[in-house]
Amino acid sequence: MGSYMNKTSVVKVGNVLIGGDNPVVVQSMTDTYTADVEKTVRQILALHKAGSEIVRITVNDESAAAAVPEIVKELAKHDCHVPLVGDFHYNGHTLLSKYPECAKALAKYRINPGNVGFGKKKDTQFAEIIKIAIANDKPVRIGVNWGSLDQALLARLIDENNAQENPLSLQQIMYKALITSALESAKYAEELGLAKDKIIISCKVSEVQDLIAVYQKLAKECDYALHLGLTEAGMGTKGIVASAVSLGILLQQGIGNTIRVSLTPAPNAPRTEEVRVCREILQNLGMRTFTPSVTSCPGCGRTTSSFFRELTSKVKDHLDEKMHTWKEQYHGVEAMKVAVMGCVVNGPGESKNADIGISLPGSGESPVAPVFIDGKKAHTLRGDNISEEFIEIVENYVKNRYGKK
């Protein structure tokens, strides 16, 4: 961990603890029309099953607000009690006041200081939401976005900057505006009576270097629990890499208590992809373990056969499918390391270093595949059923090592 690591307040969101010494929490957000209860429930269940520990939903109109209690009831029928966060912009004060059951059903409210109200109405409407949060004992995320920054605050800071002998750059003013908006709003919430351990803050931008710079400054200036994420990461590889780089750097420095990866899904792609990326970031940083890791080689001229790629895919899919039940039956199985290697160069070594590994024959090598368990050669596989036999060996290893003694 880096020198920025700060001890933050601990915030309870439903049954999930964020901040302090607690593990970094994975969040996600639905993209359904919230008033469509059936579709929204289906997507929340999918996100939660994929590993999302908190799910945010849009509450943008009266139909959505009225649907929230029903969504929570339907989720409970599936034994799903994942905390739901209501995402409010512009009219949150009205919706929470008019639909008190919605206010009770949500586990947290998200407020954007840039659009909670304008002019003289801003403080009044912000205060209305905070008072409702206090009355219902709910935490609040004060989420600032560069794309919807409080323009009055920005104008004020620009005027103050212009009067300085050595004015800041426009980029520095941007950073200052984001942080000032979040911290002034949090301070006002505390003045209204909301406890510090009910406040999470975020300052989101869409560029990697900007996000890193803003959160490094923010972490030095406060001890609120911090929500990390690019406000718009983008689609596909670009979005995944941008999120992994920015969040990875900050998390390694000890900055951030909960994360969301805001991917633009490809057409027909599952919404759960953003959850998978969050979990991969945390697991590859060594901060959390969710599912057994699979080490596999990229392939080269020695591995002319595509079989090792097919076996790697089968093993990974099998582990992902099984983890839903394994995590309840076999304590610690999520930390298991599996290796699927394609030739003799690194195959035996990587397989020995894993809990269980297989070294497949490369081009011109003897058509046998040694299997290593806990560093020792345990089996030699050959023939047309290597995939099935290796997966069976993995299954037996899990039962023997992680089963109740």
Swiss-Prot record:
Annotated metabolic or biological route of this protein: Isoprenoid biosynthesis; isopentenyl diphosphate biosynthesis via DXP pathway; isopentenyl diphosphate from 1-deoxy-D-xylulose 5-phosphate: step 5/6
Keyword Transcription regulation listed: no
Gene Ontology biological-process entries: isopentenyl diphosphate biosynthetic process, methylerythritol 4-phosphate pathway; terpenoid biosynthetic process
Cofactor remark: Binds 1 [4Fe-4S] cluster.
Domain of life of the source: Bacteria
Residues reported to bind [4Fe-4S] cluster: C297, C300, C343, E350
Pfam families in the record: GcpE (PF04551)
InterPro entries: Dihydropteroate_synth-like_sf (IPR011005), IspG_bac (IPR016425), IspG_bac-typ (IPR004588), NO2/SO3_Rdtase_4Fe4S_sf (IPR045854)
Disulfide linkage: none
Record keywords: 4Fe-4S, Iron, Iron-sulfur, Isoprene biosynthesis, Metal-binding, Oxidoreductase
EC number: 1.17.7.3
Gene Ontology molecular function terms on file: 4 iron, 4 sulfur cluster binding; 4-hydroxy-3-methylbut-2-en-1-yl diphosphate synthase activity (ferredoxin); 4-hydroxy-3-methylbut-2-enyl-diphosphate synthase activity (flavodoxin); iron ion binding
Cofactors required: [4Fe-4S] cluster
The keyword Transit peptide is annotated on this UniProt entry: no
Protein family per UniProt: Belongs to the IspG family.
PANTHER family xrefs: 4-HYDROXY-3-METHYLBUT-2-EN-1-YL DIPHOSPHATE SYNTHASE (PTHR30454), 4-HYDROXY-3-METHYLBUT-2-EN-1-YL DIPHOSPHATE SYNTHASE (FERREDOXIN), CHLOROPLASTIC (PTHR30454:SF0)
Role of this protein: Converts 2C-methyl-D-erythritol 2,4-cyclodiphosphate (ME-2,4cPP) into 1-hydroxy-2-methyl-2-(E)-butenyl 4-diphosphate.
Protein name: 4-hydroxy-3-methylbut-2-en-1-yl diphosphate synthase (flavodoxin)
Origin species: Francisella tularensis subsp. mediasiatica (strain FSC147)
Gene label: ispG
